[in-house]
Amino acid sequence: MRLSYLTALTVSTLIVNANIVEIVEGMPYVEVEANGKTYKIERVQKPDTYLTNTFALTSRPSPPFFIEPFLVTEGIETFGELEVLDFISKKKGVFIDARLANWFSKSAIPTAINMPFKLFLSDTPEREKALKVLGAEYTKNGTWNFTSAKTVLLYCNGAWCGQSPTAINALVALGYPKSKMKYYRGGMQSWQLLGLTTIVPEVKK
């Protein structure tokens, strides 16, 4: 994965191809690769665009939809959009969509893999498989060894959604190193409010 910037272009080409809505100055888009595909993450180029889907809602019933704290737990770093782009473009770890599959199948951030938060809540073969994907080892004495665990970045629907915080807290309880976990609090809502690219994942049946 790599960050892609506008480089030396002719003035005429620049006029034709320039993004009028950039991510940051000099960065019109980011290209990322996953599963043999290249995705171009950029912002919607129409400045008068606004959300019309479920993420346009300002309020949801509580419980269960309370506002989550900025720090999901002490010792775990909270990311914004630029940090997410840096993480996925430089392949710094595993990017996890912690939402239930029905949410993930509708729309997701490019390169994310779906590991629903419920996977980590009980001792099941599915949880064991997920933890091994993340680099954990199950020891002979019945505990998990996270020495080789991968760095993970988790997200869900937004600051009002508890799915990724629930997954993070479950991983902490299992002994997953806090230093190897990151939390994108803004999630799908903030991502879409900024007009960033989403995809409809190819869900394996």
Where does each model-flagged region fall?
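Sec-dependent signal peptide recognition
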Residues: 2-9
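Hydrophobic h-region of N-terminal signal peptides that target proteins for export
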Residues: 9-18
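Flexible, polar/low-complexity N-terminal or interdomain linker segments that lie immediately upstream
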Residues: 17-106
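Positively charged, proline/Ser/Thr-rich regional signature most characteristic
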Residues: 72-150, 201
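Solvent-exposed loop/turn segments at secondary-structure junctions
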Residues: 100-104, 119-121, 158-162, 187-191
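Short, solvent-exposed loop/turn and secondary-structure capping segments
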Residues: 106-110, 127, 164-168, 194-195
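Catalytic cysteine-centered active loop of the rhodanese-like fold, especially the PTP/DSP P-loop
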Residues: 135-189
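Active-site neighborhoods of enzymes that stabilize oxyanions during catalysis
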Residues: 194-205
